[in-house]
Amino acid sequence: MPDPLPLVFDAPRRALPPRHFADLADTERAAAVADLGLPAFRGKQLANQYFGRLISDPSQMTDLPAGVRDQVGAALFPELLEAAREIECDRGETRKVLWRAVDKTTFESVLMRYPDRNTVCISSQAGCGMACPFCATGQGGLKRNLSTAEILEQVRFASAELRDREGGRLSNIVFMGMGEPLANYNRVVAAVRRITASSPHGFGISARSVTVSTVGLAPAIRKLADEKLNVTLAVSLHTPDDELRDTLVPVNNRWKVDEVLDAARYYADLTGRRVSIEYALIRDVNDQPWRADLLGRKLHATLGPLVHVNLIPLNPTPGSEWDASPKPVEREFVRRVRAKGVSCTVRDTRGREIAAACGQLAAQG
């Protein structure tokens, strides 16, 4: 077991990225356009270009006069991110992008194509302060929070890439990249509102197709429920007992398993949405039959039918001595959880060979 890192809830104070059109709510966009001396309909045009046509470069917004393009480009569409590197695997069906921000901060997103859907896994922070010892992101520490626009640019880029390369459409968004989304709460919630708002106010993606993941910040889970966004909540539990979880998921020293599950139940009750429980299966660490039994009992008692367990075969990370559980152990774990009346499946792992799978993102390069 590596030496534990400290938990970091508050990101280091760094200069904010320049204000971008995507940072602004509808009323703020209207005010920003008015401040430029432009008529209100220009704001709607800009929103349609960004969220509808997926254009972030004003020089390509051909329904605007050249002078207006220059004006809004300088004031509302600064260059935020550079795609510093893109790599593929899974026969081109998985693509990881290394993003470099204007302050040289780096983070990653992953686009995954499936026969029935296209999913982008996006980051909410550069790095992560939750210090989970089996996760490369957590072991790298927290650099800073991402702005709302930096989060949304990952979505816009993936949507445009799918459309332009193959005429496809982005169908699912998961906040499972770098960072703890609920530790960057306000910007993540603002991003979700833009993602789910209908065009031209947002990207028009169904809330049911958006997943927000957390290691278990119980008060923030309850707060998210009160937002009534109706996105899917995913809780990275990884073990049902406090003794092991205190080490595997250090935030458990602040909010214990039962408190996290109670918050998840509150979320399920308010939204009517089934909660996803993420469980990275680690050989001889958290894969024992009794832990499968305890997991099934606790989830059935707390969440009833409003829960599903996603088992994740542990993905390798640099310097780690841990590895995934053998397939027979994995199958027995699934059987035991299901025997307690809880839905349980094994996640299809993508991107392992390019360090794009769950727990592997480290923004190196």
Curated annotation (Swiss-Prot):
Catalytic activity: adenosine(2503) in 23S rRNA + 2 reduced [2Fe-2S]-[ferredoxin] + 2 S-adenosyl-L-methionine = 2-methyladenosine(2503) in 23S rRNA + 5'-deoxyadenosine + L-methionine + 2 oxidized [2Fe-2S]-[ferredoxin] + S-adenosyl-L-homocysteine; adenosine(37) in tRNA + 2 reduced [2Fe-2S]-[ferredoxin] + 2 S-adenosyl-L-methionine = 2-methyladenosine(37) in tRNA + 5'-deoxyadenosine + L-methionine + 2 oxidized [2Fe-2S]-[ferredoxin] + S-adenosyl-L-homocysteine
HAMAP family: RNA_methyltr_RlmN
Function: Specifically methylates position 2 of adenine 2503 in 23S rRNA and position 2 of adenine 37 in tRNAs.
PANTHER family per UniProt: 23S RRNA METHYLTRANSFERASE, RADICAL SAM CORE DOMAIN-CONTAINING PROTEIN
EC code(s) of this entry: 2.1.1.192
Native source organism of the sequence: Mycolicibacterium gilvum (strain PYR-GCK) (Mycobacterium gilvum (strain PYR-GCK))
More about this protein: Reaction proceeds by a ping-pong mechanism involving intermediate methylation of a conserved cysteine residue.
Location(s), subcellular: Cytoplasm
One Gene Ontology cellular component: cytoplasm
Residues annotated to bind [4Fe-4S] cluster: C128, C132, C135
Positions of the Radical SAM core domain: 114-352
Listed CDD domains: Radical_SAM (cd01335)
Active site per database record: E108 (proton acceptor), C358 (s-methylcysteine intermediate)
Chief place of localization: cytoplasm
Family to which the UniProt record says this protein belongs: Belongs to the radical SAM superfamily. RlmN family.
GO BP: rRNA base methylation; tRNA methylation
Coiled coil: none
Key words of the record: 4Fe-4S, Cytoplasm, Disulfide bond, Iron, Iron-sulfur, Metal-binding, Methyltransferase, rRNA processing, S-adenosyl-L-methionine, Transferase, tRNA processing
Enzyme class name: transferase
Cofactor binding: number and manner: Binds 1 [4Fe-4S] cluster. The cluster is coordinated with 3 cysteines and an exchangeable S-adenosyl-L-methionine.
Cofactor requirements of the protein: [4Fe-4S] cluster
Molecular function terms, GO-annotated: 4 iron, 4 sulfur cluster binding; metal ion binding; rRNA (adenine(2503)-C2-)-methyltransferase activity; rRNA binding; tRNA (adenine(37)-C2)-methyltransferase activity; tRNA binding
Binding site for S-adenosyl-L-methionine: G179, E180, S213, S236, L237, H238, N315
Disulfide linkage: C121-C358
InterPro entries xrefs: Aldolase_TIM (IPR013785), Elp3/MiaA/NifB-like_rSAM (IPR006638), Methyltransferase_A (IPR040072), RNA_MTrfase_RlmN (IPR027492), rRNA_lsu_MTrfase_RlmN/Cfr (IPR004383), rSAM (IPR007197)
Protein's UniProt name: Probable dual-specificity RNA methyltransferase RlmN
